[in-house]
């Protein structure tokens, strides 16, 4: 038999758990994007652009374009995910970016402390789950449905 406290906790958990996960995920993405917009990667925007030119050089996407695409994806995607605005588009965009980050870090092994793919994999799985679930009840998207 479920006691009243457990029933109330289940009800609260069912209502608030997903918005909390979505909000915190978005909030934690924002500084990653903002940091890249402000200073690039490791505090050096020119170095970040040069790194992207060297690693991902192709005629379609320059390092400059990729640097800002990555930064805006994390920054604006984080804001959208946090507040549930264009949630699926934002989460899918971050998921795609993280899939490329996983592929880049794959040769370094699993652990992030050795530049492995652990951290981008975690972000990718969480944002993919958000993409699948959508914005949920407590979101800006819900207000426009």
Annotate each PLM feature.
Residues 44-61:
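Perimembrane loop-to-helix junctions flanking transmembrane segments
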Residues 1-42, 60-72, 76, 83-145:
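Extended, low-polarity transmembrane helix blocks
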């Amino acid at each position: 038999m479920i006691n009243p406290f457990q029933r109330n906790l289940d009800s609260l958990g069912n209502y608030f758990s997903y918005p909390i996960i979505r909000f915190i995920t978005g909030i934690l993405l924002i500084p990653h994007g903002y940091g890249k917009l402000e200073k690039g990667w490791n505090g050096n925007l020119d170095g970040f652009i040069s790194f992207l030119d060297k690693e991902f050089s192709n005629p379609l996407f320059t390092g400059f374009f990729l640097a800002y695409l990555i930064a805006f994806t994390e920054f604006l995607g984080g804001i959208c995910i946090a507040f549930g605005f264009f949630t699926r588009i934002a989460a899918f965009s971050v998921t795609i970016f993280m899939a490329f980050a996983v592929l880049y870090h794959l040769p370094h092994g699993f652990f992030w402390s050795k530049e492995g793919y652990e951290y981008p994999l975690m972000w990718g799985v969480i944002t993919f789950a958000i993409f699948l679930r959508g914005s949920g009840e407590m979101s800006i998207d819900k207000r426009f449905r």
